[in-house]
UniProtKB/Swiss-Prot annotation:
Name under which the protein is recorded: ATP synthase epsilon chain
One function term, GO molecular function aspect: proton-transporting ATP synthase activity, rotational mechanism
Organism: Ruegeria pomeroyi (strain ATCC 700808 / DSM 15171 / DSS-3) (Silicibacter pomeroyi)
Known role: Produces ATP from ADP in the presence of a proton gradient across the membrane.
Keywords: ATP synthesis, Cell inner membrane, Cell membrane, CF(1), Hydrogen ion transport, Ion transport, Membrane, Transport
Subunit structure, as described in the record: F-type ATPases have 2 components, CF(1) - the catalytic core - and CF(0) - the membrane proton channel. CF(1) has five subunits: alpha(3), beta(3), gamma(1), delta(1), epsilon(1). CF(0) has three main subunits: a, b and c.
Pfam families: ATP-synt_DE_N
Main subcellular location of this protein, as a coarse class: membrane
Database matches in InterPro entries: ATP_synth_F1_dsu/esu, ATP_synth_F1_dsu/esu_N, ATPsynth_dsu/esu_N
Phylogenetic classification of the source organism: Bacteria, Pseudomonadati, Pseudomonadota, Alphaproteobacteria, Rhodobacterales
Entry's family note: Belongs to the ATPase epsilon chain family.
TM region positions: none
Gene: atpC
Bilayer topology term: Peripheral membrane protein
Compartments, record wording: Cell inner membrane
Length: 136
């Protein structure tokens, strides 16, 4: 059993991380999960949350707003809609994300399908909870 796996975190703007890691905690849409070496092959969608990476330099965290994670036995690739290292997140970043979520929620209220409204409301609640979790 290998002790590490390749981890890549990519957003539309840039490659944020590419390194060997021992574990990554993923905010999955169906619940949090931890990817480790020799994990069963899995693809999951992400919900807004904090991605925690345990690498050789210690632990690093990234704020993600959604996307996909592809887990394999020896690698994990995360394609994030938006991703920001937690150390770089400011109140302005968070306010922008909350404003986008609020706008999506308002737009969804006109939809006939309640699931669209519910999803938008959940996104807004997740964004506001992230600010509290991060102390912003």
């Amino acid at each position: 059993m290998a002790n590490t796996m390749q981890f890549d975190l990519v957003s539309p703007e840039r490659l944020l991380a590419s390194l060997q890691v021992s574990a990554v905690q993923i905010p999955g849409a169906d619940g949090d999960m931890t990817a480790m070496p020799d994990h069963a092959p899995t693809i999951t969608t992400l919900r807004p949350g904090v991605l925690k990476v345990e690498g050789p330099e210690g632990t690093s965290e990234y704020l993600v707003t959604g996307g996909f994670a592809q887990i394999g036995a020896d690698s994990l690739s995360v394609l994030a809609e938006k991703a920001i290292p937690v150390t770089e997140v400011t109140r302005a970043h968070l306010d922008e994300l909350i404003a986008e979520a609020r706008s999506s929620h308002e737009a969804a209220k006109g939809q006939e399908h309640t699931s669209v409204v519910d999803d938008a409301a959940k996104l807004l609640a997740d964004m506001e909870a992230l600010g509290t979790h991060m102390g912003l």
